Amino acid sequence: MMLGAVRRYGVVHALRASVPRTICRPSNSQLLRCQTSPVTACPQSVRLLHKSSPFFSSASAQAQAQPDDLQSAAPQEPLREFTDLAERGLVDPKIIRAIVKDMNIKTMTDVQSQTLREILQGDDVLAQAKTGTGKTLAFLTPVFQNIMKDPSLKGLNWRRSQASSSDIRAIIISPTRELAEQIAVEARRLAAHSGVIVQTAVGGTQKREGLRRIQREGCHVLIGTPGRLKDVLSDSYNGVTAPNLSTLVLDEADRLLDDGFSDAIIDIQRLLPDPMKVDRQTLMFSATVPREVMQMVRKTMKPNFKFVKTVRDDEVPTHLTVPQKYVILRGYENAMPALLEFVTKYVEGEKENPNQRPFKAIVYFNSTVQTNLVYETFRNIVEQRHHPLRRVRVYEIHSQLTQARRTRSSDFFRAAKSAILFSSDVTARGMDFPDVTHVIQVSIPRDRATYIHRLGRTARANKTGEGWVLTHRGELPEFLKQLEGIPLNLDKETFATATVDMTKPELDPKSPATRFIQEIKDAVREVPESLKRRAYTSLLGPLRGYFARKQDLIQAINNCVVHGYGLPVPPQLSPTLARNLGLDRVPGVRIANYRGSSDNMSTRPDYRGGDRDMWASNSRRGREFNSDRRESRFGNHRNADDFFGGRRRAYRDDY
């Protein structure tokens, strides 16, 4: 271990790593002072150790562990400007040039100021930091510095790299493709003048293509998701190895473990060099520090790791400060008209109020099929030449898109001035989209934590934002129970479309809601019928436990697909699926009989109702699509994307 430290960090760092530390038990006031203010100085040789300290807490709804081995960082002279790092000889000037000149970032965030010095000293560090606080640059900067000072890589040339596939010095593990790609974008900007080569290994992309790129260009920093990283590193024939790995980073550690990646992370570590033979620094960044994270810390980090807490105990969480409202829908079929009404009124209001921020929203759904269906519907609307929303871009992100498509959606939405991103939960954590004015959640979220993380995509970087939830009246008791204590206010005035009975044969022509309902009906006709049928099935699973009676749930979903999506009757379920969902004896469920169709409907209402003529007048148009559309396993998608260009590839699942 000493030899590895000498080789990698020099004699001073090796001595620092090996000399016994002075341990003292500070007072509570000392602990708080060390956590909240980096200005107060204390001897560097003193390392604070606390046991069940009162300042170790989290705003997370999860039960928090009270670990007894968290070692707090000792405060020193503060770092405020990135140029300070170069002036004090802590970071190579080429890295600082990329940050200050190219990225135009001069002043550090609190997270960067509090973590950079500790990480640059070579210690293993567990940092508790929220997303959107600059933590990516906080770990990338020392990662690059470690590479730049590695004597075996002297002569790095940004004009001509001589890296190989076995030159990997840092591996960064991220829970999602989107976050991994986001980190990679920032890493490549940081590498502009250094000669450091950044590569990615994420699910949803062509593995062979990624391997060839690493083999052709080499790699110093490999960023990826657990499944693909394990796949790449476990292949002994591809030549991608990390025999001299100096840094391992786990970003969003709490989510990595929440998503069940613990075993994959352990497997990845087994594929890396023995840390007793090749010394490496391990960094973990996590918004919360539950027991699962501490268990991973003990398996991964050195015993003398540092804990840097950048979340103040008195800091009010986003979900307690952002204005939040909920709207009660008469039926699920009211959701799309309500969305259209809200967006249209806001955009039209921008003309009257030039100081109003451009509308930029993320709309969350609980299923990928719902996400795709609503995206296709709104896309048909914004493509209309004279529609008020013609200048609003629309994008979709969910796990059934290829990684290339998801990356393009993220990039375009991030850069857009006014846009709507229809998303599943793949963007709910860690993703940073600037200037998001609204987060709108359709239907009850899976759990309280999901609601909070989704809401966190707005009101970032000292900007304001709003949160809205459109919930069915049948979900209301469970919704209020789930989000008890969160300052949600009932809104009864904004949406004229929310309470309209769309099951009636005729709509009131004088109602302001009729305009939006009719626009949705016209647009959804162009959506493939196969996608609508799958949307019906996708609603059954997530909503099954939220209604008091299964019959009420089936009635609500049947109304949605008939009066909202325009299907003549609700789709049939296979006998096996109906039985597995416990719906085989529920009135209103149509069960397929493969000898000939039969229904299990004790009372079979006329689902075509008064809308029959409205839908029938364009039934042929609703079934026949332009030649530039084709059927895929996830629905009938356009062959070319007006906003992105290029051909849509087949969908792939996440690792």
Curated annotation (Swiss-Prot):
Tell me its EC number(s), please: 3.6.4.13
Query: Is Membrane set as a keyword in this record?
Result: no
Motif DEAD box mapped to chain: 251-254
Family membership: Belongs to the DEAD box helicase family. DDX18/HAS1 subfamily.
What protein does this entry describe?
Answer: ATP-dependent RNA helicase mss116, mitochondrial
Q: Which residues bind ATP?
A: A129, K130, T131, G132, T133, G134, K135, T136
How does the record comment on the protein's domains?
Answer: The Q motif is unique to and characteristic of the DEAD box family of RNA helicases and controls ATP binding and hydrolysis.
> Where does this polypeptide localize?
Mitochondrion matrix
Biological process terms in GO annotation:
mRNA processing; regulation of translation; RNA splicing
Which GO terms of the cellular component aspect does the record hold?
Answer: mitochondrial matrix; mitochondrion
Compositionally biased spans, kind Basic and acidic residues: 605-614, 621-642
CDD domains on file: DEADc_MSS116, SF2_C_DEAD
The Helicase ATP-binding domain extends over: 116-307
- Boundaries of each Helicase C-terminal domain copy? 341-503
Gene name linked to the record = mss116
The transit peptide extends across 1-56
- Give the catalytic activity: ATP + H2O = ADP + phosphate + H(+)
What GO molecular function terms would the record report? ATP binding; ATP hydrolysis activity; RNA binding; RNA helicase activity
Where along the sequence does the record place the motif called Q motif? 84-113
Keyword Protein transport listed: no
Pfam families the UniProt entry points to:
DEAD, Helicase_C
User: What is this protein for, i.e. what is its function?
Assistant: ATP-dependent RNA helicase required for mitochondrial splicing of group I and II introns. Also required for efficient mitochondrial translation.
Q: Which species is this UniProt entry from?
A: Aspergillus fumigatus (strain ATCC MYA-4609 / CBS 101355 / FGSC A1100 / Af293)
Residue ranges for the region (Disordered) are: 594-642
Taxonomic lineage from the root = Eukaryota, Fungi, Dikarya, Ascomycota, Pezizomycotina
Q: Which UniProt keywords apply?
A: ATP-binding, Helicase, Hydrolase, Mitochondrion, mRNA processing, mRNA splicing, Nucleotide-binding, RNA-binding, Transit peptide, Translation regulation
